[in-house]
Protein backbone atom coordinates (compact mmCIF):
# COMPACT_ATOMS: atom_id res chain seq x y z
CA UNK A 1 0.00 0.00 0.00
CA UNK A 2 1.36 3.40 -0.85
CA UNK A 3 2.15 5.71 2.01
CA UNK A 4 -0.59 8.19 2.68
CA UNK A 5 -3.20 6.47 0.51
CA UNK A 6 -6.36 7.19 2.48
CA UNK A 7 -9.11 4.73 3.26
CA UNK A 8 -11.42 6.83 1.09
CA UNK A 9 -8.99 6.58 -1.83
CA UNK A 10 -8.59 2.81 -1.51
CA UNK A 11 -12.33 2.24 -1.21
CA UNK A 12 -13.32 4.43 -4.15
CA UNK A 13 -10.34 4.11 -6.50
CA UNK A 14 -12.56 2.79 -9.29
CA UNK A 15 -15.09 5.63 -9.11
CA UNK A 16 -15.03 9.11 -10.54
CA UNK A 17 -14.92 11.97 -8.06
CA UNK A 18 -18.63 12.80 -8.08
CA UNK A 19 -19.82 9.21 -7.66
CA UNK A 20 -17.20 8.54 -4.99
CA UNK A 21 -18.40 11.49 -2.92
CA UNK A 22 -22.02 10.44 -3.38
CA UNK A 23 -21.17 6.91 -2.25
CA UNK A 24 -19.25 8.27 0.74
CA UNK A 25 -22.29 10.22 1.91
CA UNK A 26 -24.78 7.38 1.41
CA UNK A 27 -27.06 6.85 4.38
CA UNK A 28 -26.04 10.08 6.08
CA UNK A 29 -28.81 12.47 7.12
CA UNK A 30 -27.95 15.34 4.82
CA UNK A 31 -29.99 18.51 4.67
CA UNK A 32 -29.71 21.80 2.85
CA UNK A 33 -28.80 24.80 4.98
CA UNK A 34 -29.97 28.04 3.36
CA UNK A 35 -28.48 31.04 5.14
CA UNK A 36 -28.76 34.10 2.92
CA UNK A 37 -26.53 33.52 -0.06
CA UNK A 38 -24.95 30.46 1.61
CA UNK A 39 -26.64 27.30 0.34
CA UNK A 40 -23.86 24.80 0.99
CA UNK A 41 -24.91 21.21 1.60
CA UNK A 42 -24.55 20.75 5.36
CA UNK A 43 -25.58 18.20 7.94
CA UNK A 44 -28.50 19.16 10.16
CA UNK A 45 -26.19 19.88 13.08
CA UNK A 46 -24.85 23.08 14.52
CA UNK A 47 -21.75 24.64 13.03
CA UNK A 48 -20.21 28.08 12.98
CA UNK A 49 -19.76 29.93 9.69
CA UNK A 50 -18.72 33.57 9.93
CA UNK A 51 -20.88 36.01 8.01
CA UNK A 52 -17.93 37.14 5.88
CA UNK A 53 -17.00 33.62 4.77
CA UNK A 54 -17.78 32.68 1.16
CA UNK A 55 -19.10 29.13 0.81
CA UNK A 56 -19.83 27.62 -2.59
CA UNK A 57 -23.30 26.12 -3.02
CA UNK A 58 -21.46 23.05 -4.31
CA UNK A 59 -19.41 22.57 -1.13
CA UNK A 60 -20.36 19.86 1.35
CA UNK A 61 -19.78 20.66 5.01
CA UNK A 62 -20.15 18.16 7.85
CA UNK A 63 -21.24 18.99 11.41
CA UNK A 64 -19.10 20.71 13.99
CA UNK A 65 -17.07 22.74 11.49
CA UNK A 66 -15.98 26.25 12.38
CA UNK A 67 -15.27 28.57 9.44
CA UNK A 68 -13.77 31.91 10.39
CA UNK A 69 -13.80 35.38 8.85
CA UNK A 70 -13.04 35.82 5.15
CA UNK A 71 -12.52 32.13 4.46
CA UNK A 72 -13.37 30.79 1.01
CA UNK A 73 -14.63 27.22 0.53
CA UNK A 74 -14.93 26.55 -3.19
CA UNK A 75 -16.75 24.24 -5.56
CA UNK A 76 -16.24 20.53 -5.00
CA UNK A 77 -14.84 20.82 -1.47
CA UNK A 78 -15.96 18.19 1.04
CA UNK A 79 -15.17 19.35 4.58
CA UNK A 80 -15.32 16.59 7.17
CA UNK A 81 -16.69 16.72 10.69
CA UNK A 82 -15.12 19.08 13.20
CA UNK A 83 -12.77 20.94 10.87
CA UNK A 84 -11.59 24.40 11.91
CA UNK A 85 -10.69 27.23 9.55
CA UNK A 86 -9.17 30.21 11.36
CA UNK A 87 -9.52 33.17 8.99
CA UNK A 88 -8.55 33.97 5.38
CA UNK A 89 -8.26 30.26 4.59
CA UNK A 90 -8.83 29.17 0.97
CA UNK A 91 -10.04 25.64 0.16
CA UNK A 92 -10.49 24.82 -3.54
CA UNK A 93 -11.84 21.67 -5.12
CA UNK A 94 -12.23 18.98 -6.08
CA UNK A 95 -10.87 18.32 -2.57
CA UNK A 96 -11.97 15.86 0.10
CA UNK A 97 -10.95 16.81 3.64
CA UNK A 98 -11.41 14.31 6.48
CA UNK A 99 -12.33 14.98 10.10
CA UNK A 100 -10.83 17.33 12.69
CA UNK A 101 -8.36 19.11 10.43
CA UNK A 102 -7.13 22.58 11.41
CA UNK A 103 -6.31 25.28 8.88
CA UNK A 104 -4.61 28.43 10.14
CA UNK A 105 -4.73 31.85 8.53
CA UNK A 106 -3.85 32.20 4.85
CA UNK A 107 -3.45 28.48 4.22
CA UNK A 108 -4.30 27.74 0.57
CA UNK A 109 -5.29 24.12 0.02
CA UNK A 110 -6.56 22.45 -3.14
CA UNK A 111 -5.49 25.04 -5.69
CA UNK A 112 -4.65 23.95 -9.22
CA UNK A 113 -1.19 22.59 -9.85
CA UNK A 114 1.66 24.95 -10.73
CA UNK A 115 2.88 22.48 -13.36
CA UNK A 116 2.99 24.44 -16.64
CA UNK A 117 1.63 21.54 -18.69
CA UNK A 118 -1.63 21.52 -16.72
CA UNK A 119 -4.57 22.22 -19.04
CA UNK A 120 -7.45 22.62 -16.56
CA UNK A 121 -8.31 18.91 -16.46
CA UNK A 122 -10.23 17.66 -13.39
CA UNK A 123 -7.71 16.65 -10.73
CA UNK A 124 -8.11 15.98 -7.03
CA UNK A 125 -6.72 16.34 -3.52
CA UNK A 126 -7.56 13.99 -0.66
CA UNK A 127 -6.70 14.71 2.98
CA UNK A 128 -7.13 12.38 5.95
CA UNK A 129 -8.03 13.18 9.56
CA UNK A 130 -6.48 15.28 12.31
CA UNK A 131 -3.96 17.26 10.29
CA UNK A 132 -2.68 20.73 11.13
CA UNK A 133 -1.94 23.22 8.34
CA UNK A 134 -0.27 26.30 9.78
CA UNK A 135 -0.04 29.79 8.32
CA UNK A 136 0.53 30.14 4.55
CA UNK A 137 0.79 26.39 3.90
CA UNK A 138 0.00 25.51 0.28
CA UNK A 139 -1.14 22.14 -1.08
CA UNK A 140 -1.86 21.62 -4.80
CA UNK A 141 -4.04 19.11 -6.62
CA UNK A 142 -2.75 16.60 -9.17
CA UNK A 143 -1.76 17.39 -12.76
CA UNK A 144 -2.98 14.75 -15.22
CA UNK A 145 -6.69 14.00 -15.71
CA UNK A 146 -7.94 12.12 -12.66
CA UNK A 147 -4.61 12.47 -10.82
CA UNK A 148 -4.54 13.00 -7.06
CA UNK A 149 -2.41 14.55 -4.40
CA UNK A 150 -2.77 12.46 -1.22
CA UNK A 151 -2.18 13.55 2.37
CA UNK A 152 -2.67 11.09 5.23
CA UNK A 153 -3.63 11.72 8.86
CA UNK A 154 -2.21 13.31 12.01
CA UNK A 155 0.39 15.35 10.15
CA UNK A 156 1.74 18.76 11.14
CA UNK A 157 2.70 21.18 8.38
CA UNK A 158 4.27 24.27 9.90
CA UNK A 159 4.20 27.76 8.41
CA UNK A 160 4.99 28.27 4.71
CA UNK A 161 5.32 24.58 3.84
CA UNK A 162 4.46 23.52 0.30
CA UNK A 163 3.15 20.20 -1.03
CA UNK A 164 3.17 20.20 -4.82
CA UNK A 165 1.06 18.30 -7.34
CA UNK A 166 0.76 14.51 -7.24
CA UNK A 167 2.64 14.10 -3.96
CA UNK A 168 1.81 11.28 -1.55
CA UNK A 169 2.34 12.11 2.12
CA UNK A 170 1.80 9.43 4.76
CA UNK A 171 0.75 9.65 8.39
CA UNK A 172 2.29 11.23 11.51
CA UNK A 173 4.82 13.38 9.67
CA UNK A 174 6.14 16.78 10.71
CA UNK A 175 7.20 19.38 8.15
CA UNK A 176 9.12 22.19 9.85
CA UNK A 177 8.75 25.74 8.54
CA UNK A 178 9.25 26.19 4.80
CA UNK A 179 9.65 22.49 4.06
CA UNK A 180 9.00 22.13 0.33
CA UNK A 181 8.06 19.15 -1.83
CA UNK A 182 8.29 19.33 -5.62
CA UNK A 183 5.86 17.29 -7.71
CA UNK A 184 5.41 13.52 -7.42
CA UNK A 185 7.32 13.21 -4.13
CA UNK A 186 6.44 10.37 -1.75
CA UNK A 187 6.90 10.83 2.00
CA UNK A 188 6.29 7.76 4.13
CA UNK A 189 5.01 7.65 7.73
CA UNK A 190 6.73 9.28 10.74
CA UNK A 191 9.10 11.43 8.69
CA UNK A 192 10.47 14.70 10.08
CA UNK A 193 11.36 17.27 7.43
CA UNK A 194 13.75 19.93 8.75
CA UNK A 195 13.08 23.61 8.18
CA UNK A 196 13.75 24.87 4.64
CA UNK A 197 14.32 21.33 3.35
CA UNK A 198 13.75 21.22 -0.42
CA UNK A 199 12.90 17.88 -2.05
CA UNK A 200 13.42 17.33 -5.79
CA UNK A 201 10.54 15.98 -7.87
CA UNK A 202 9.95 12.21 -7.90
CA UNK A 203 12.10 11.64 -4.79
CA UNK A 204 11.01 9.40 -1.93
CA UNK A 205 11.63 9.77 1.79
CA UNK A 206 11.35 6.53 3.73
CA UNK A 207 9.50 6.07 7.00
CA UNK A 208 11.07 7.27 10.26
CA UNK A 209 13.67 9.25 8.30
CA UNK A 210 14.68 12.79 9.21
CA UNK A 211 16.24 15.63 7.23
CA UNK A 212 18.34 18.42 8.69
CA UNK A 213 17.46 22.07 8.23
CA UNK A 214 18.15 23.56 4.78
CA UNK A 215 18.83 20.12 3.28
CA UNK A 216 18.79 19.72 -0.50
CA UNK A 217 17.26 16.32 -1.32
CA UNK A 218 17.88 15.19 -4.91
CA UNK A 219 17.71 11.40 -4.44
CA UNK A 220 15.77 9.02 -2.22
CA UNK A 221 16.30 9.06 1.56
CA UNK A 222 16.17 5.48 2.86
CA UNK A 223 13.91 4.74 5.83
CA UNK A 224 15.27 5.08 9.38
CA UNK A 225 18.11 7.37 8.26
CA UNK A 226 19.14 11.00 8.84
CA UNK A 227 19.98 13.11 5.78
CA UNK A 228 21.63 16.49 6.09
CA UNK A 229 23.51 18.98 3.94
CA UNK A 230 23.49 20.69 0.54
CA UNK A 231 23.50 18.37 -1.29
CA UNK A 232 22.32 16.06 1.47
CA UNK A 233 24.29 13.04 2.62
CA UNK A 234 23.22 10.21 4.91
CA UNK A 235 24.72 10.81 8.35
CA UNK A 236 23.56 7.69 10.21
CA UNK A 237 20.40 6.08 11.51
CA UNK A 238 17.74 8.23 13.18
CA UNK A 239 18.59 6.69 16.57
CA UNK A 240 16.86 9.21 18.84
CA UNK A 241 13.70 9.25 16.72
CA UNK A 242 13.56 5.46 16.60
CA UNK A 243 14.06 5.21 20.37
CA UNK A 244 11.22 7.67 20.92
CA UNK A 245 8.97 5.41 18.86
CA UNK A 246 9.84 2.37 20.95
CA UNK A 247 12.22 0.50 18.66
CA UNK A 248 13.97 -2.30 20.53
CA UNK A 249 17.72 -2.03 21.13
CA UNK A 250 18.32 -5.18 19.09
CA UNK A 251 16.50 -3.72 16.08
CA UNK A 252 18.54 -0.53 16.39
CA UNK A 253 21.74 -2.58 16.32
CA UNK A 254 20.59 -4.36 13.17
CA UNK A 255 19.70 -1.07 11.47
CA UNK A 256 23.04 0.43 12.45
CA UNK A 257 24.85 -2.57 10.97
CA UNK A 258 22.76 -2.29 7.79
CA UNK A 259 23.75 1.39 7.59
CA UNK A 260 27.42 0.41 7.95
CA UNK A 261 27.14 -2.09 5.10
CA UNK A 262 25.28 0.35 2.83
CA UNK A 263 27.36 3.45 3.56
CA UNK A 264 30.69 2.48 5.11
CA UNK A 265 31.79 -0.29 2.79
CA UNK A 266 32.99 -0.27 -0.80
CA UNK A 267 29.97 -2.28 -1.96
CA UNK A 268 27.41 -1.12 -4.48
CA UNK A 269 23.73 -1.24 -3.47
CA UNK A 270 23.13 -4.71 -4.90
CA UNK A 271 26.18 -6.15 -3.16
CA UNK A 272 25.28 -4.40 0.09
CA UNK A 273 21.77 -5.85 0.02
CA UNK A 274 23.18 -9.35 -0.49
CA UNK A 275 25.49 -8.89 2.49
CA UNK A 276 22.68 -7.54 4.68
CA UNK A 277 20.55 -10.57 3.84
CA UNK A 278 23.46 -12.92 4.55
CA UNK A 279 24.64 -11.38 7.83
CA UNK A 280 21.54 -9.98 9.52
CA UNK A 281 18.35 -11.72 10.69
CA UNK A 282 15.04 -11.17 8.98
CA UNK A 283 12.85 -8.48 10.53
CA UNK A 284 10.23 -6.08 9.15
CA UNK A 285 12.48 -3.02 9.40
CA UNK A 286 15.33 -4.55 7.42
CA UNK A 287 12.91 -5.95 4.84
CA UNK A 288 11.40 -2.51 4.33
CA UNK A 289 14.86 -0.95 4.05
CA UNK A 290 15.95 -3.53 1.47
CA UNK A 291 12.77 -3.15 -0.57
CA UNK A 292 13.10 0.64 -0.52
CA UNK A 293 16.73 0.80 -1.70
CA UNK A 294 16.27 -1.87 -4.39
CA UNK A 295 13.22 -0.10 -5.87
CA UNK A 296 14.65 3.38 -6.13
CA UNK A 297 14.27 4.90 -9.61
CA UNK A 298 16.39 7.95 -8.74
CA UNK A 299 18.86 6.05 -6.58
CA UNK A 300 19.47 6.59 -2.89
CA UNK A 301 21.45 9.39 -1.26
CA UNK A 302 24.96 8.17 -0.45
Question: What are these regions, as identified by a protein language model?
Answer:
Residues 5-8, 17-18, 22-52, 57-58, ...:
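Terminal amphipathic alpha-helical/low-complexity segments used for targeting or macromolecular assembly
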Residues 48-228, 232-233:
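Structural signal for interior beta-strand "rungs" in well-ordered beta-sheet cores
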